[in-house]
C-alpha cells in the first residue's frame, strides 16, 4: 500500500519495468470506489511447479512454475474485501483481483477498472487503436508519445467499430525499451467480464485499464465471490522469449473437457476466397431486395449463377481436398438468408438449419465422407447473437446428424442486442457459451470477429481457432502492408492461435484488388503463425499452376 492506496511495481534484472502503479475499481450506482482506504489484513505466499500436457499446441508439455502471493485487503469504512493475487514467472507477471463473499460487498457494478501500468519512459510500441468492436487494424509502430498523433490515421473502415480515445490501444500490446527490454501487456482467462483495453496518459506514460461498456455504459455486473481476468506482463531481454512464453496459457484453468479424443488439428480448403475476392457470392438469388426466413420462396427464385456454395463446386473442392490429403472443406453461403445479411441490423438473419436449393447437405456430406474428407460448417450470425443462441442447439444437432465436427462462426456488423459491443461482458459470455455448448456436441469452434483470445484454449481446447485481427481477407479489400504479419506473433497470437487463412498464390483478385504478398511470403506464414487450424485459402486451379509450392503447404501446414 501507498498509504491506504493499493499499488504494485515490477523489476527485472535489477531494473524498474513498471513504476509504482495504482490498483482498484471505480464503482457505479452509489458504490464507494475501491481505490483507497484499504489496510492489509493478511498476506499468503506459495510456490507451484507442475508440468502439464496440452491437447494440441506447439509444445508436447508445458512447465507451469511460479511464485504466488495473495494480498488480502479490507476497505475500512465499508467493510468491503478485495484481494490481489500476483503470480511471478521467469518470463513475467500476472495479477488479478479476487473478491471473497465476505463483509458488505456482495453485488456491485463496475464503472471502470483502474489498474495502472506506469512505464519508465517513452518506449517503442506496436499497437492498434482501442476499439470496442474490432481488432481488424494494421499494426502501427511509434513511440508512446506518437500514439496520439498517429491514431486517427491508424483507424481504417470496418462494418462495426467504436474507437473510444485518442490514446487508447488494444492488447496484446508489444513494447520495447531503449535498453532492449521487451514488455508485452495483455490479459488471461477472460470469463464473465468485459475485454480490457489500455488508455495512455502521454504526459506520465502511464496506461490505465479501460473496459468495454455495455449498452447502458456500465463496464460489468459482479457478484461475489468472483475473480477478474489476469492482467499479464511478459518481460524479457530476448524477443524470442516473447514468442515462446506460455505465461498466458499457464494462467488459465486446466482443461475442463474430460474426453478430448475428438479434438484434433485440421488442415482445410474452402469455398470462401471466391466470395471474398469477388469471383462468386454467398447469396443464391438476385430476385429479392429483402428476404425473410419464413416467407421467401427460394424454390421458385431464379439462381443468380454466382452462388459459390453449389453442389458441383463443393464437390470440386472435396475432390481436391481428398486428392491432396486435406482433412476438410469449409463451405460458406450454404444456408438461406444471405441476400440481405449485413448492414440492416436484422435480428432474424439466419436459422443455421435451412440450405439453399442448390446445396444438398445430406448428399454432399456423404460424398465427402466417402472420400475421407469432412465438411466444416459455417455459422455467420451477422452479430445477432440472441438469434444464434435461439437456434444454437438445433444447429449443433444438425451438424452431428450430418457428420460435421467443426464450425466457423462469424460476428460481422453491429451487435444485436442493439447498443451492445463485441467485447462487452454480455458478448464475452456468449462467445464462451458457444464454445462450451459446442463441446457437449463434440464440435470444434473457429470464431471470427469474436474477442481476441486470452488462453482459454487450454481450458476449452475445442476452441481451435480465432480470427480477431486483420487477416488475409483484407488483401482482397485493398491490401495489407507486409510488416503486419511480422508483428502478429508478438501481439495477437500471444493469447492463442489465429485462423489467418494464408496460401494465396494468385495475387490479382477478381474485384480488382492486389494482394501485397508473394508466394514465398504466403508459404512463410504457415511457419511463423502457429495454428492447429490451417487453411489453404486459394482456388484449386491456382494451386495446380504451382504444384511445387503447393507441396510445401501439404508438407508443413
Each model region followed by its residue ranges:
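N-terminal accessory beta-strand-rich subdomains and adjacent acidic, glycine-rich linkers
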Residues: 1-258
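Short, flexible loop/turn elements at secondary-structure junctions
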Residues: 75-77, 88-90, 121, 236, ...
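Active-site-proximal structural scaffolding
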Residues: 110, 225, 262, 307-310, ...
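Short conserved micro-motifs at the rims of enzyme active sites and ligand-binding pockets
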Residues: 128-130, 186, 195-198, 242-246, ...
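An acidic-aromatic substrate-binding cleft motif
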Residues: 223-324, 328
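Short, hydrophobic/amphipathic alpha-helical patches that form generic packing surfaces
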Residues: 274, 488, 502, 522-531
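Aromatic- and carboxylate-enriched substrate-binding clefts and catalytic-loop regions
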Residues: 332-509
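Glycine-rich, aromatic-lined ligand/substrate-binding cores of catalytic
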Residues: 508-557
Amino acid at each position: 500500500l501507498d498509504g491506504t492506496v493499493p499499488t504494485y511495481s515490477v523489476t527485472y534484472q535489477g531494473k524498474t519495468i513498471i513504476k509504482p502503479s495504482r490498483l482498484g475499481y471505480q464503482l457505479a450506482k452509489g458504490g464507494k470506489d475501491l481505490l483507497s482506504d484499504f489496510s492489509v489484513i493478511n498476506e499468503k505466499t506459495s510456490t507451484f511447479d507442475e508440468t502439464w500436457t496440452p491437447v494440441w499446441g506447439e509444445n508436447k508439455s508445458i512447465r507451469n512454475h511460479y511464485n504466488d502471493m495473495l494480498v488480502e485487503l479490507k476497505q475500512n469504512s465499508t467493510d468491503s474485501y478485495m484481494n490481489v493475487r500476483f503470480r511471478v514467472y521467469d518470463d513475467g507477471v500476472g495479477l488479478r483481483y479476487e473478491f471473497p463473499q465476505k463483509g458488505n460487498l456482495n453485488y456491485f457494478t463496475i464503472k471502470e477498472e483502474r489498474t495502472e501500468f506506469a512505464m519508465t519512459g517513452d518506449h517503442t510500441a506496436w499497437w492498434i487503436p482501442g476499439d470496442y468492436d474490432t481488432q481488424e487494424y494494421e499494426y502501427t509502430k511509434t513511440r508512446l508519445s506518437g500514439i496520439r498523433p498517429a491514431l486517427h490515421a491508424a483507424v481504417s473502415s470496418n462494418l462495426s467499430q467504436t474507437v473510444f480515445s485518442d490514446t487508447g490501444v488494444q492488447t496484446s500490446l508489444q513494447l520495447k525499451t531503449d535498453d532492449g527490454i521487451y514488455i508485452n501487456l495483455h490479459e488471461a482467462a477472460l470469463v464473465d467480464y468485459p475485454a480490457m483495453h489500455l488508455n495512455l496518459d502521454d504526459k506520465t506514460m502511464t496506461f490505465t485499464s479501460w473496459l468495454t461498456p455495455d449498452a447502458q455504459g456500465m463496464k460489468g455486473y459482479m457478484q461475489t465471490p468472483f475473480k477478474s481476468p489476469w492482467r499479464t506482463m511478459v518481460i524479457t531481454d530476448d524477443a524470442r522469449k516473447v514468442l515462446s512464453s506460455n505465461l498466458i496459457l499457464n494462467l488459465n484453468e486446466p482443461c475442463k473437457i474430460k474426453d478430448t479424443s475428438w479434438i484434433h488439428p485440421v488442415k482445410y480448403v474452402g469455398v470462401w476466397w471466391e466470395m471474398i475476392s469477388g469471383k462468386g457470392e454467398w447469396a443464391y438469388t438476385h430476385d429479392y431486395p429483402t428476404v425473410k426466413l419464413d416467407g421467401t420462396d427460394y424454390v421458385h427464385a431464379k439462381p443468380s449463377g454466382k452462388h459459390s456454395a453449389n453442389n458441383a463446386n463443393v464437390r470440386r473442392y472435396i475432390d481436391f481436398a481428398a486428392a491432396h490429403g486435406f482433412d476438410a472443406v469449409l463451405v460458406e453461403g450454404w444456408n438461406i438468408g444471405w441476400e440481405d445479411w449485413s448492414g440492416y441490423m436484422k435480428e432474424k438473419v439466419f436459422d443455421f438449419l435451412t440450405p439453399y436449393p442448390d446445396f444438398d447437405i445430406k448428399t454432399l456430406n456423404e460424398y465427402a465422407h466417402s472420400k475421407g474428407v469432412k465438411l466444416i460448417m459455417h455459422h455467420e450470425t451477422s452479430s445477432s447473437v440472441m438469434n444464434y443462441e435461439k437456434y444454437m442447439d438445433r444447429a449443433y444437432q444438425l451438424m452431428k446428424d450430418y457428420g460435421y465436427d467443426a464450425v466457423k462462426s462469424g460476428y460481422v456488423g453491429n451487435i444485436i442486442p442493439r447498443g451492445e459491443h463485441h467485447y462487452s461482458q454480455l458478448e464475452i459470455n456468449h462467445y464462451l457459451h458457444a464454445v462450451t455448448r459446442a463441446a457437449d456436441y463434440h464440435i470444434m469452434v473457429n470464431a471470427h470477429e469474436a474477442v481476441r483470445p486470452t488462453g482459454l484454449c487450454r481450458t476449452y481446447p475445442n476452441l481451435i481457432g480465432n480470427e480477431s485481427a486483420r487477416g488475409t481477407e483484407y488483401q482482397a479489400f485493398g491490401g495489407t502492408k507486409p510488416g503486419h504479419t511480422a508483428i502478429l506473433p508478438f501481439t495477437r497470437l500471444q493469447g492463442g492461435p489465429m485462423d489467418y487463412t494464408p496460401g494465396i498464390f494468385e495475387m490479382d483478385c477478381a474485384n480488382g484488388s492486389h494482394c501485397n504478398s508473394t508466394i514465398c511470403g504466403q508459404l512463410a506464414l504457415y511457419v511463423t503463425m502457429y495454428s492447429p487450424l490451417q487453411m489453404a485459402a486459394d482456388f484449386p486451379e491456382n494451386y495446380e499452376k504451382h504444384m511445387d509450392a503447393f507441396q510445401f503447404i501439404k508438407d508443413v501446414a
